[in-house]
Amino acid sequence: MSEDRRSPTDEAPREGELPRSPGDNFRIALPNFEGPLDLLLHLIKEHRVDIFDIPLALITEKYLEHLERMREINLDIAGEFLVMASTLAHLKSRMLLPRQDVASAQEGAEVLAVAEETEDPRAELVRRLLEYQKYKDAAEQLATQDLLGRDVFARNVPVEAVPIPEEEVGLQEFSVLKLVEALDRVLERLQPKLQHEVVRERVTLSEAILRVVERLRPHGQVLFESLFTEEETPSRQEVVITFLAILEMVKRRLIRVVQDEPLGPILLLPNGDALEKLAPTEVDDSDYR
């Protein structure tokens, strides 16, 4: 079969047009198939044949023609297309062989062998085509749905609690007070535990100042954070009293507070020999109660 590949582009270029290269004279547009099964479905629909009664001679011929067109335009043919071509040729040859009669076969294993031999060779191909068509239809249906983040966008709102219908409430016919009374009876049967409350001694401002002085004298400096270590587990009241003691010592110019950089560690340094002259009775706690 010969084709006339001449087109209007073979004519001489008109005035003002650039000459065309030989590769631009002949162009073929082929549909893009996902695989050999997709191509077979296309051929079956194009020639309007029954998928359950595939004319292998016609379909094989059209399939090979399509592969030949792909070669003509220098397309790389995937191996799966060539495997399907050989499969179609094999099925076509099997269809030409005479079928054996199951009734004339012997009983036992020979019957099963003959039954398999007399089965329609196209059955497996039809099954694969139907299964592929099912997944293809599902993919096309999913492709029509809106895509989150592209077509639709979710609102970032807190999920509200779903109200429970009244008929699903478990305590509908039971008093909650009775449940509380039952809990009280269980607690009464438990062995009572001895409870005692530990009360910390109240720290005065003078005592807090002396504690800071004791931390400063050995090393000549102390970190502010080290006055509140987790090992000593200071109470909220002790933390406040210690902070007031530091303010009082700065006010009386007993210590200096130094920070070399923003958000850096805070150092407490003695102001000369002022700490050596400090007497415990010089601070009155009445101003900070």
UniProtKB/Swiss-Prot annotation:
Entry keywords, A to Z: Cell cycle, Cell division, Chromosome partition, Cytoplasm
One protein family per Pfam: SMC_ScpA
Subcellular location, principal: cytoplasm
Induction conditions: The 3' end of scpA overlaps with the 5' end of scpB, indicating the genes are cotranscribed.
Subcellular location: Cytoplasm
Subunit structure and binding partners: Component of the Structural Maintenance of Chromosome (SMC) condensin-like complex composed of ScpA, ScpB and the Smc homodimer. ScpA and ScpB bind to the head domain of Smc. The presence of the three proteins is required for the association of the complex with DNA.
Function: A conditionally essential component of the chromosome segregation machinery. Participates in chromosomal partition during cell division. Important for positioning of ParB-parS complexes (ori of replication) and of the ter replication site, as well as for segration of the ParB-parS complex and thus chromosome segregation. May act via the formation of a condensin-like complex containing Smc, ScpA and ScpB that pulls DNA away from mid-cell into both cell halves.
Family in the record: Belongs to the ScpA family.
Name listed for the protein in its UniProt record: Segregation and condensation protein A
Organism: Myxococcus xanthus (strain DK1622)
Gene name as annotated: scpA
